[in-house]
Amino acid sequence: KPELRYKAARQGLQELGHETTLSYLGEAARLVFEESDLLPHLNPGLMTAEDFQALRPVSASMGIMLESVSDRLMEKGEAHHGSPDKIPARRLETLRLAGEATVPFTSGLLIGIGETRLERVESLLALRRLHDEHGHIQEVIIQNFRAKPETKMAAALEPDLEELLWTIAVARILFGPEMSIQAPPNLSPGVLTRIVEAGINDWGGVSPLTPDFVNPEAPWPHLDHLARETEEAGKLLIERLTVYPRYALEGE
């Protein structure tokens, strides 16, 4: 968490009347939940059982990307080296606690960061086991890595389309027709029909108002264009809430 590493973050939080980022997030989510027509979706990273207990009443859903279960990626020179919050066991524990707290949850894989196809299958199976036990995973994202300037992986090769399509297809096979499988449309322009044909049924959050803050170099497709591409693949583009219907009906 930022307050554990940066003095400026601690000072900023204190000025806002909070000791932790998650406390501040909880207040912001409560204001959105109570004073607007929006439903908060929270993605604050690793969480404890107490964190879920505090945030569940002020959010409709939450999420954390598993990315990969490969401990090998934590080694020096690999994508997750020096990132303790990306230790697979810690992310899996957050996913497990989300299930125990009955939080409608989003997770998924980041492909093309040095993992093998076998490691992708192992990651998908880990998510499947957690979902089989708790039934809380609403959607599984298959996100392709995009290299960013001025980062340690700026020169890293990005995964090709076939790797993305293969992983989507395997996710659909492993999770069956009931699970929502998602891929960001702004990261694969020009091939959206092939992505649908591979097995997705959801584009995720696509905003006409804000950029993709994680991938600002990749603008969202215009909704009219996305609707046409979706129709060409034999599907319809419709809006949905951050919480899926059956989870909304099961909510307290």
Model-derived segments and spans:
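Conserved Radical SAM active-site core
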Residues: 1-132
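Auxiliary Fe-S-binding modules of radical SAM enzymes
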Residues: 11, 31-36, 121-252
